[in-house]
Regions:
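Conserved ASCE/P-loop NTPase catalytic core
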Residues: 1-102
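Phosphate-sensing "switch" segment of ASCE/P-loop ATPases
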Residues: 64, 73-88, 101-211
């Protein structure tokens, strides 16, 4: 039957480029399944450039993936509808304050409250680029670290781990974030409330990862 077509193979792509179309992001998250994906970008502007294009407007996807909420799309170009159950997507971005403002234009679009933000002052110290005996090349160094992370990942696949908070830890968690939320209520602004609530969740996630 010539009408039958072979099924297109779907590869697993764990490292998604920051400049990826919305439809491709859907497809990658679907194909990766529980492994999920991560976006690494040394320049926030790379993602800003994609989000400013018609093909790359996917703030909603990032917001949904932060809470593993099911996402779906149906476009003629994609053929059958795409459904992604409990998408898992992480992002690690670096950039200047101006680049960050270009990415998160307002506190009310939901993306800001879903980000963990780390700021640090610049420490200007000159590091000579001259080669030194016994010096480790950066790429080789991070390749070695990558091998260690891969080993940890493979170990956890064979030995699933569940992190459980004690009653005292739950009490401390609730006390701290309830205090933060009370401060927001006093200010009379709604947007920071979402930041406090979501960061209460992220504190638990970080505790699980560090454990």
């Amino acid at each position: 039957d010539r009408s039958l077509q072979p099924e297109e193979p779907h590869g697993i792509v764990l490292m998604l480029p920051a400049n990826t179309s919305k439809s491709r992001t859907y497809a990658h998250l679907r194909d990766n399944g529980q492994l999920g994906a991560i976006i690494n970008a040394s320049e926030i502007n790379t993602m800003v450039s994609a989000l400013s294009q018609d093909y790359g407007r996917q703030d909603d996807v990032y917001c949904a993936a932060a809470h593993h909420e099911d996402i779906s799309s149906s476009f003629k170009v994609d053929g059958l509808p795409i459904f992604v159950r409990e998408p898992r997507l992480g992002m690690c971005l670096t950039g200047t304050p101006d680049q960050f403002v270009a990415l998160v234009r307002t506190l009310e679009n939901g993306l800001y409250s879903r980000l963990g933000i780390l700021t640090a002052p610049a420490k200007w110290v000159w590091h000579s680029a001259a080669p030194k005996e016994g010096q480790i090349e950066n790429r080789a160094y991070f390749r070695e670290l990558g091998g260690e992370v891969l080993g940890m990942h493979e170990m956890l696949l064979e030995s699933p781990t569940e992190v459980v908070f004690t009653a005292a830890q739950w009490e401390e968690h609730s006390r701290r974030f309830e205090s933060c939320l009370d401060g927001v209520v006093i200010e009379g602004c709604d947007s920071p409330g979402a930041i406090v609530v979501r960061h209460g969740l992220y504190a638990m996630r970080l505790a699980a990862v560090l454990t």
